[in-house]
Amino acid sequence: GHVPCGKDRRKCGYHADCCNCCLSGICKPSTSWTGCSTSTFLLTR
C-alpha cells in the first residue's frame, strides 16, 4: 500500500511521513506542491 518517495525511495505512508502522493501517482515531498494533497488516494496504509 506504499509507494516510493522521490529520489531517496523511502516509503510513503500518510502525509505525516516523508511525502504526499499526488493524483498522478508521483510522490512529492511537501503538501505545498501544486496538485498534491494529504488525501489517502494512494496511501492505503
Curated annotation (Swiss-Prot):
Pfam families cross-referenced by the UniProt entry: Toxin_19
Keywords from the UniProt entry: D-amino acid, Disulfide bond, Ion channel impairing toxin, Neurotoxin, Secreted, Toxin, Voltage-gated sodium channel impairing toxin
One cellular component term from this protein's GO annotations in UniProt: extracellular region
Recorded GO MF terms: sodium channel regulator activity; toxin activity
Disulfide bond sites: C5-C19, C12-C22, C18-C27, C21-C36
Localization, UniProt: Secreted
Residues spanning the signal sequence: none
Family named by the database record: Belongs to the conotoxin I1 superfamily.
Protein task: Iota-conotoxins bind to voltage-gated sodium channels (Nav) and act as agonists by shifting the voltage-dependence of activation to more hyperpolarized levels. Produces general excitatory symptoms.
Name under which the protein is recorded: Iota-conotoxin-like R11.12
Organism this protein belongs to: Conus radiatus (Rayed cone)
